[in-house]
């Protein structure tokens, strides 16, 4: 399982046999350019579908070790074959998120998402994904303090058994 530090899960999750990712993403050239954008040597991308929507991996659960090995070997081979370029971030995002979806589609491995891509910005209470809000909170201490207070209140309300951790953090920060 993989969890980004900007993704908060506020409920217990059920795990089964399918891959679980945060959500699907639209294919846009500025984030997910066409395959001919990538300059690679000695690596041929298998006959993957270019139309399958990428999987955001802010949360990722992969229960099948055979699939995990297939996907990671494809992603690593792709990154190792990357020719010097100006934008390795696009290569990394392709290898991590788009290739994951392509591999799942290719192997017919079932995929489930925690959030629906078409309702990402609608209110819901199960997950918090900070995305661009991270920079806003870095730049604005009042915004950051407000977010921290809301998280503490949520933890105290929904997970009172962990309230002691908040108290320990307060105590440690006062030393």
Where are these regions (language model features)?
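Glycosyltransferase catalytic domains, chiefly GT-A lineage
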Residues: 1-175
């Amino acid at each position: 399982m993989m969890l980004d530090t900007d993704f908060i899960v506020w409920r217990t999750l059920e795990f089964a046999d399918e891959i679980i990712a945060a959500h699907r993403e639209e294919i846009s050239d500025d984030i997910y350019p066409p395959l001919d954008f990538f300059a690679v040597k000695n690596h041929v991308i298998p006959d993957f579908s270019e139309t399958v929507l990428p999987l955001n991996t802010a949360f990722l659960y992969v229960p099948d070790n055979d699939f995990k090995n297939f996907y990671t070997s494809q992603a690593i081979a792709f990154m190792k074959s990357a020719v010097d370029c100006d934008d390795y971030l696009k290569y990394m995002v392709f290898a991590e998120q788009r290739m994951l979806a392509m591999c799942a589609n290719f192997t017919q491995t079932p995929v489930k998402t925690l959030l629906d891509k078409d309702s990402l910005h609608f209110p819901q209470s199960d997950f918090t994904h900070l995305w661009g809000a991270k920079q806003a909170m870095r730049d604005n201490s009042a915004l950051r303090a407000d977010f921290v207070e809301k998280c503490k209140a949520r933890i105290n309300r929904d997970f009172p058994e962990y309230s002691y951790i908040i108290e320990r953090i307060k105590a440690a920060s006062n030393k």
